[in-house]
Amino acid sequence: GIPVNGMENGSVYWSNWSGLADVTNSIQVQRGIGLSKLGLFSVGGTVNIVTQSTEVNRQGSVYYGIGNDRYQKMGFNLSSGLLPKGWAFSIMGTRTTGDGYVKGTNFEAWSYFANVSKKFGRNHILSLTAFGAPQWHNRRSNKQSIEDYDLHKDGIRMNTCYGYINGQIVPTYSGYNEYHKPQISLNHFWQINGKSTLSTSVYVSNATGGGRKVYGKDANRLQYNYKTGRPNENTSLTPDGLIDYLPVMEDNKNSDHGSDAIFTMGTNSHDWYGLLSTYTNDLSKSLKLTVGIDGRYYKGYHYDKISDLLGGAYYKDNKLAWRDPDTKLREGDKVNQDYLSKILWMGAFAQLEYNREHYKAFVSTSVTSHSYKREDPGKYGAYGNQETYPVANVKTPWSNFVPFSVKAGFNYRFNGMHNVFVNGGYVTKAPMMDNIFVDNTPLSNPIPEKIATGEIGYGFNYRTLSVMLNGYYTQWMDKSVTKAIGSWNGPRACIPNIDARHMGIELEASYQPLEWLRVYGFFTIGDWRWTNDVNFPLFNEQNEKIGEYHAYIKNLHVGNAPQTSAMLGLSCMPVSGLTLGVDFNYYGRHYADFAAADRTDEKDRAEAWKLPDYSTVDLNLNYDFKMGTFRGQLFGNVNNLFNRKYISDALDGSDHTRETAVAWYGFGITWTAGLRISF
């Protein structure tokens, strides 16, 4: 039940939780706005991962796996089970390395998990858990034109975000990331009596890490233009199109004023403390009450620090107001930005469930207090200019929001095999912190986002056949977006009050005609569109407003995800212990991503470029066997079996065509195989 979505932008970075699958006891998935085991309300649904505890038997395992492009993973997992005096222990560790499918994307990741649990009598369990996944990885951040992929020797594995120094791969801007987000939680479960329970978690997460940036007046010499996928006019390149560091390093070395292009680490660390407590009570045989609180305090640390002078003796920076701009800076010194983000969150929720033989109903509500604050001593003009930029202004006032939600649903079961259901809800949501601050200035009068959503569906379950059909309609109002224009660090558009409509139909089914054969699949089709034109301000790097613009996006499809998808799968067990599976996947009506701030021409209301539809085939194998007192499990996966060439992501171009879009191709054929020995 502990939340993991980022407090500032709402994102989930799965690399922070690598290895968690090896200690997962169960996964609770709630789709849409239906009845949830959690009080937290998410429009799309929630995934709750429950890790090992006193319920796990005494066991252990070791694992080794390999895959394409020198992928390797090794790990172990040990659990004591419940010991005679009520204690239970679990520990897990893994290491994963590889070169990556795309050129220059090698990585190394570790993960660890430890749990100590103690049962006190029959009614209390205390559990202390610590886990994390320190990792570093090189990445491809630039999309390229389709023509560039066709002409490049690496084809769809092409990557322009790196070069070589002394024979070693060296990523450039946004091409390297390192992070470690350990989390420690203390959980108490209390079976108060036969009808009521209280579950409480206190947790802390102290994360450190960030990503590489290129900084300085000659930064463009070490990066491509992200909108065109082409080099800048002065980008330093080798004959095969990689970043050529040597001329830049030579110029830095010979400079009489320090380096003109350096590497910095854009640090995004944080301290996050939280309390989550949920009380449940069976008021009667058919009525259940769940109430709870969710409190959080978050402090984010955002600064750039020099990581490599690239041959120079020092660097000078005039962006931080508290430091003399003539200071000679070395590795480890801060440049460009240095600010704190603070978030206070306190929420309460309640859910009432009514369950009878043929029908089930629920109503749920929540209210939350969100408060945002930013402290930015470094972004207030030139050094010593305190008359224009007084010191008191380095701290913003708190920006306060009180969002709430309410949802309700009804499910009717009849004839032992049919059910129909309807769910609806209304949510107000505080805009993410990243979308209300332009440097140290909050947007004037930011308002909460609002979501009205509903779904209706039918289910059929009889012996070997199950079918679920549902339709959904969601109106998202006053959404806020912040977007850099022209370049990664160019002018920023802060676009409030965007409305979108999402509606569609979803079908999923499973059929088992024989004991050893199962057929399953799904089909979804949606219509997701922006529904209004909006005004927005544009700010330059000095936080100065440079104009008001109008974005013409009404009726354009939302980009960056396929709006039609389907899958048909077969799973068979030809012999005892052996499972073979094949999945046929289809994706269509995928519009390229685009920035609303780029749609300022009233005459240009053309749809973003629509990517070609594509399909892939995946295989999987699992074989369970015994070796004396040990249990073995051999498994493997082959994705994109026929090496289908397809575009998975794209950014729209100036005329919304294939020729001006920049894109990433999906991976060709990839595979993994592994062996687990359990005892």
Give short role names for the model-derived ranges.
Residues 4-31, 50:
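Short acidic/polar hinge/loop motifs at secondary-structure boundaries
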Residues 34-36, 46-81, 93, 97-103, ...:
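Short strand-turn segments of transmembrane beta-barrel domains in outer membranes
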Residues 59, 85-89, 122-128, 195-198, ...:
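Repeated loop/turn-to-beta-strand initiation elements of outer-membrane beta-barrel proteins
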Residues 64-70, 82, 95-99, 132-136, ...:
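Transmembrane beta-strands of outer-membrane beta-barrel pores
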Residues 117, 125-187, 212-264, 327-329:
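Acidic/polar loop-and-plug regions of large Gram-negative outer-membrane beta-barrel proteins
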Residues 131, 170, 411, 422, ...:
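Conserved C-terminal beta-signal and adjacent last beta-strands/turns
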Residues 284-288, 294-296, 330-476, 512-514, ...:
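Structural signature of Gram-negative outer-membrane beta-barrels, strongest in the C-terminal barrel
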Residues 285, 355, 473-475, 495-596, ...:
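Gram-negative outer-membrane beta-barrel transporters
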